[in-house]
Each structure stands twice: as structure tokens, then as C-alpha cells.
């Protein structure tokens, strides 16, 4: 994510309570490095130079339910990440779900990033469509599916109703 040539670790903690927000969820990025790691890493020690925390937004969103590398979605040469929050309520649609793409960059990460701060320059939010779709239940990099030179993502919505058929699931 930070372009240092070492793979990073992405961890989801869907039941975390960031800022006292019950089950908003958190995710953690631990930066890879030369020379290895100690036998355990205290995630509360992430300070921006060794990794960072991504805070979920609202109560019961369970952000971090699913996490994945996203490839390089914006084509800037840095790997991006993908975080699912399958029970988020975008636009008042109960449990339609949300997913977040967070852009990688060369250094300068703060120790905590609130997913509500994604503004297009640092990442973006993908809102589920309909009530109870559970969009973001599964997330994954897809590679460059359409051949435009940018990596694409797959977002699973396990209870979506494609073509009006209940609970058939859909991946937009």
C-alpha cells in the first residue's frame, strides 16, 4: 500500500467499537518490512509509519466483515485496499451494505483513518442498492476485467434480488 516493495497485511475486525460506536468495525493495515517481525504485533501500536487503523462509520455497520487487496484501482502505481461493511445503511436503506476502496500512497499515512473521510482523492464508497442486500458481504480484486488499464473490484451482495428473484445474490 505504501509502495516500499514489501507486501502489507490487511486485517478485518468487524465487531470492533471505534470511538465507542458499537460494532462499527475496524480494519488494520500492517506494513511489511525487511528483517521480519517480532513474535506478536500489538495493533494498538500502529502509528502511521508501521501501519494504520481504518474506523467504521455507524453502529452495526460491521466494517471489516470482508477485506481484500483491490489491486491498483486508480492507476497511481500503489496498491489499494477494499473493505466490506455488509450491514451498513447507505441512503437509509437498511443493511443494503457498503464497501470502501482506500487508495495506497507513498508514506504520510496517519495512525487512524475514518472511512467517513473518503472523498474521492483518498478513496471512495460503494453503496449497496436495496434494503437487506448485504452488499460488501464478500469483496475481492478482479484484475483488469475490461482492459482499460485499471484494476477492477468484485463486491458480493448475498441477499440481492436480481431479476426480481428473492435471495439469489448478485455481484454488480
Which role does the model predict for each range below?
Residues 1-172:
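Conserved beta-strand/short-helix segments
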Amino acid at each position: 500500500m505504501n509502495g516500499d516493495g514489501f507486501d502489507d497485511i490487511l486485517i478485518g475486525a468487524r465487531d470492533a467499537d471505534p470511538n465507542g460506536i458499537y460494532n462499527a468495525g475496524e480494519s488494520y493495515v500492517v506494513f511489511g518490512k525487511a528483517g521480519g517481525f517480532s513474535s506478536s504485533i500489538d495493533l494498538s501500536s500502529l502509528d502511521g509509519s508501521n501501519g494504520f487503523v481504518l474506523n467504521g462509520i455507524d453502529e452495526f455497520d460491521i466494517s471489516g466483515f470482508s477485506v481484500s487487496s483491490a489491486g491498483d484501482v486508480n492507476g497511481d502505481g500503489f496498491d489499494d485496499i477494499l473493505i466490506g461493511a455488509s450491514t451498513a445503511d447507505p441512503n437509509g436503506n437498511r443493511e443494503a451494505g457498503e464497501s470502501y476502496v482506500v487508495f495506497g500512497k507513498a508514506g504520510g499515512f496517519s495512525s487512524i483513518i475514518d472511512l467517513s473521510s473518503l472523498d474521492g482523492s483518498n478513496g471512495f464508497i460503494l453503496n449497496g442498492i436495496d434494503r437487506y442486500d448485504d452488499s460488501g458481504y464478500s469483496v475481492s480484486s478482479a484484475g483488469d476485467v475490461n482492459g482499460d488499464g485499471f484494476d477492477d473490484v468484485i463486491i458480493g451482495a448475498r441477499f440481492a434480488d436480481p431479476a426480481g428473484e428473492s435471495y439469489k445474490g448478485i455481484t454488480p
